[in-house]
Amino acid sequence: YRPEEMLVICPSESGLTRGPVEIVKQARSLGIPCVCTVQSGGSPLERYCDVVIVKPSGKELALPSTKGYSVGLLVLLLCLLEGARVKGSVGQAEYGQINQSLASLGGSCQSIAGQTVKWFLRRQYPVMKPPFYRIIGYGANYGTAVEGALKMMESHKRMTAAYELEEFLH
């Protein structure tokens, strides 16, 4: 691929993490355009990106970034959808249908959040009792297990480890 055929996308909360900043610097030195999402303006990551999208999710009150992460994914999904529309990969009817589905997400998320809280309150003791947790993933979902373990540790401060299924069975 040529640089004009590539794009580096860096979803970020603070824009301070060294890895994404270094990746964007390297990409820019190769002439590859860069886009980032950040929680608020003025970060080092923004200085090296061609496009900066400030996420409208507001400040996170809890340590695990759930709201900002979800909004960042939605923003990137909208960017990809718009790119597909402009490129002609998505027809007008499909584009409208996807936008309509995305517009209903807010209400769905509130409903699911309420159901999740009720579920947790009914199971709070058995969920919080163990001193540690193991999250097991398989194949492409191993990354999901790793991210899930991180979010669990951030949320309840108990040791949580992620394992790949076949490795765990040894």
Where are these regions (language model features)?
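Structural signal for conserved beta-strand scaffold positions within catalytic alpha/beta enzyme cores
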Residues: 10, 53-54, 111, 162-164
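Long, charged amphipathic helices and adjacent flexible linkers at domain junctions
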Residues: 98-117
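Glycine-rich phosphate-binding loops that contact phosphosugars or nucleotide phosphates
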Residues: 1-96, 101, 138
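A short, well-structured juxtamembrane/interface segment
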Residues: 113-129
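A ubiquitous structural signal for well-ordered alpha-helices
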Residues: 23, 105-108, 148
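A generic local structural motif
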Residues: 21-22, 39-40, 119-122, 168-170
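Short, structured loop/turn "capping" segments at alpha-beta junctions
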Residues: 88-92, 116-120, 159
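Anionic-ligand anchoring segments at beta-strand to alpha-helix junctions in alpha/beta enzyme folds, i.e.
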Residues: 1-8, 30, 128-170
